[in-house]
Amino acid sequence: MAEQLLPQALYLSNMRKAVKIRERTPEDIFKPTNGIIYHFKTMHRYTLEMFRTCQFCPQFREIIHKALIDRSVQASLESQKKLNWCREVRKLVALKTNGDGNCLMHAACQYMWGVQDTDLVLRKALCSTLKETDTRNFKFRWQLESLKSQEFVETGLCYDTRNWNDEWDNLVKMASADTPAARSGLQYNSLEEIHIFVLSNILRRPIIVISDKMLRSLESGSNFAPLKVGGIYLPLHWPAQECYRYPIVLGYDSQHFVPLVTLKDSGPELRAVPLVNRDRGRFEDLKVHFLTDPENEMKEKLLKEYLIVMEIPVQGWDHGTTHLINAAKLDEANLPKEINLVDDYFELVQHEYKKWQENSDQARRAAHAQNPLEPSTPQLSLMDIKCETPNCPFFMSVNTQPLCHECSERRQKNQSKLPKLNSKLGPEGLPGVGLGSSNWSPEETAGGPHSAPPTAPSLFLFSETTAMKCRSPGCPFTLNVQHNGFCERCHARQINASHTADPGKCQACLQDVTRTFNGICSTCFKRTTAEPSSSLTSSIPASCHQRSKSDPSQLIQSLTPHSCHRTGNVSPSGCLSQAARTPGDRAGTSKCRKAGCMYFGTPENKGFCTLCFIEYRENKQSVTASEKAGSPAPRFQNNVPCLGRECGTLGSTMFEGYCQKCFIEAQNQRFHEARRTEEQLRSSQHRDMPRTTQVASRLKCARASCKNILACRSEELCMECQHLSQRVGSVAHRGEPTPEEPPKQRCRAPACDHFGNAKCNGYCNECYQFKQMYG
């Protein structure tokens, strides 16, 4: 069996390379004698990437995943929206690691080199660092982290010096590689957060752990206790310039660590990992562990020094909102060829795939030999050359070239029934092929090649471009190998109607998309805005085997009811395609009533061809419905193209005339422009500091509510207050009531002590002039 032949770990594909890695690893560790922490010299800079598996068929892809990927951890983290929730970055996959208590070291080794820490190189380096080097800084950070933890805060627990020393000694013993019998029946003791922090300093490389916040029950899913493992561990014992800034990404679930690696050349997404969690309608930053109080105040600066931080625009929880989140850039595969195990494993997978295909083919032939009445599929006779029939999407066969199976059968039938067609011109006498129907029948298996039946069981040898019919009876569209022989529409019908729609899928074509508009992708949205006549006449040629250029989910509703429509005077085999008609038959009919249509009409379709008759009926029904309702049904009309440059999608008023993608780009551009403007304002404020201090040293007006500068040192009031007091005095002299002085408003500019006025839009004169000059 291929499942048994496929290695269950990367290092099993080439033991020589695995031995070479295990020999180099301990030699690369530098052990200073002056108390400095043990650390790697060069090998900590390597990174592993998994090969792509989409080129294999789904059945064999399942075998690869069973061999290498820890699907339970991956499914758990993805269901909790901790892993692969951001569509802007590449997907991460969890590789299997041994669960012997040393899984943290196994995961870190696999992320860098593709082998596990079976020789305990990292474990021994961790233990030696805690025993033989100066650990006062580690102990101090651990004590600070413990005092901030929930156990100390909520219980009021207090430790004396002896308690702290005992706890620290216990942590050092847990890191030992010589433990004869660990707790919980494991070979080694499990490690904790402080061990991850020490490991990041040994590797001189940040470690990011993706984990749930709560320890949950495996049966009920209820919360047991808070988890503190997840977060960011920076190698703070080293200057940032001496560290490798691409992090190691690990997953943690059910007390088990796994490496989370990217897929090589998987797509245009960014090779990065978000530094936030998306939880309860907001974005929450990942915790940075073991920071002192001064370091906690400069956390953002530390992240940018030890990581390559980039800002990514993502869609918010509210519709139409965009957020900028921080993400750490990940390294690409850089293992040298002499120690690259992924390439060897990929070559082995390709070899096993060929053997698996041959075995599957032999098993299928043996099953057919045991049951000769069972129809066989002539898929292995297909050639990679299209059929010569115009508009036919199928491929020719070795036995029927230059035609496909169905076109060859149709030609034979037309030639054998040509005299009958000349004598009987009516469409009732033509036993043609119905739209989307198949000529295959079990009685015809004895002679000649046949087309593939709609229930073909073996589809894994073909790519998605191989044109074959959907296995649903009467469906004219092409199957998808990932939908078990059904097309997208028929596969969607089989899904439970109560199943909630996935926001990442188009509701029309059911394809994974990065952005949708009202639940549908841009392609389907443009199709809904087009007129029915243009979409039908341009996308469906007259051949009964023509695969529609439009999406099947848009046309199946209108084509299926009419593909084999029977009337009282039409026989069951009277479903006729235009391609099945002969020149002799067309001589007795007239052109379609629709102007510019190249096909022929029939009396039962009121002079229209089949497609134009479908359009006629739909238009008639829509007109009748609009007359009854009094107003036309709401449609996507009067839409304008997106305002973005060289963008062919439709814009939306919700996105200021842009499509969703261009709106995010525009928002990002505005964000950078606003940041540049803010920096210009700061620089201008620094330039005006001497002048501001000089103005502040001048004498101010004696009135408490006035901040104006005196024009003359001999006076106590400014000119404005003098005029105001004179005006108030004259009014009081005339016996008129004194108007209350209106409260003055501060200048709108930040950090300005002057008062604004209405003429300057709320700014003071100086700030208004500055704003006019510099914008």
UniProtKB/Swiss-Prot annotation:
Which stretches does UniProt call biased (Polar residues)?
A: 567-580
User: What InterPro entries would the database entry show?
Assistant: OTU_Deubiquitinase, OTU_dom, Znf_A20
Residues annotated as binding Zn(2+) 1 are 387, 392, 404, 407
Q: What is its EC number?
A: 2.3.2.-, 3.4.19.12
One of the Pfam families matching this protein, by short name? zf-A20
- Positions carrying Phosphoserine are 451
Query: Binding of Zn(2+) 5: at which residues?
Result: 642, 647, 659, 662
Tissue specificity of this protein? Found in most tissues during development. Strikingly high levels are found in lymphoid organs, including the thymus, spleen, and gut-associated lymphoid tissue. Constitutively expressed in immature and mature thymocyte subpopulations as well as in resting peripheral T-cells; activation of these leads to down-regulation.
Q: Where is this region: Interaction with TNIP1?
A: 369-775
Where are the residues of the annotated region Required for proteasomal degradation of UBE2N and UBE2D3, TRAF6 deubiquitination, and TAX1BP1 interaction with UBE2N? 590-640
Residues binding Zn(2+) 2 are 470, 475, 487, 490
Asked if the Swiss-Prot or TrEMBL record annotates the protein with the keyword Repeat, the reply is: yes
Zinc fingers (A20-type), as residue ranges, are: 381-416, 464-499, 500-533, 586-621, 636-671, 695-730, 741-775
Q: Where along this sequence does the record place binding of Zn(2+) 6?
A: 701, 706, 718, 721
Query: Do you know which PROSITE patterns this protein is assigned to?
Result: OTU, ZF_A20
Listed A to Z, the keywords are: Acetylation, Apoptosis, Cytoplasm, DNA-binding, Hydrolase, Inflammatory response, Lysosome, Metal-binding, Multifunctional enzyme, Nucleus, Phosphoprotein, Protease, Repeat, Thiol protease, Transferase, Ubl conjugation pathway, Zinc, Zinc-finger
Q: Which GO terms describe its cellular component?
A: cytoplasm; lysosome; nucleus
Q: Where is this region: Disordered?
A: 415-455, 567-590
| Stated induction or repression of this protein's expression | By cytokines. TNF-alpha may regulate expression in the thymus. Up-regulated in presence of reactive oxygen species (ROS), like H(2)O(2), in LPS-tolerized macrophages.
State its location(s): Cytoplasm; Nucleus; Lysosome
Q: How does it assemble?
A: Homodimer. Interacts with TNIP1, TAX1BP1 and TRAF2. Interacts with RNF11, ITCH and TAX1BP1 only after TNF stimulation; these interaction are transient and they are lost after 1 hour of stimulation with TNF. Interacts with YWHAZ and YWHAH. Interacts with IKBKG; the interaction is induced by TNF stimulation and by polyubiquitin. Interacts with RIPK1. Interacts with UBE2N; the interaction requires TAX1BP1. Interacts with TRAF6.
Q: What is known of its domains?
A: The A20-type zinc fingers mediate the ubiquitin ligase activity. The A20-type zinc finger 4 selectively recognizes 'Lys-63'-linked polyubiquitin. The A20-type zinc finger 4-7 are sufficient to bind polyubiquitin.
The task this protein performs is described as: Ubiquitin-editing enzyme that contains both ubiquitin ligase and deubiquitinase activities. Involved in immune and inflammatory responses signaled by cytokines, such as TNF-alpha and IL-1 beta, or pathogens via Toll-like receptors (TLRs) through terminating NF-kappa-B activity. Essential component of a ubiquitin-editing protein complex, comprising also RNF11, ITCH and TAX1BP1, that ensures the transient nature of inflammatory signaling pathways.
Q: Which PANTHER family match?
A: TUMOR NECROSIS FACTOR ALPHA-INDUCED PROTEIN 3, UBIQUITIN THIOESTERASE
Q: What is this protein called?
A: Tumor necrosis factor alpha-induced protein 3
High-level lineage = Eukaryota, Metazoa, Chordata, Craniata, Vertebrata
Gene designation per UniProt = Tnfaip3
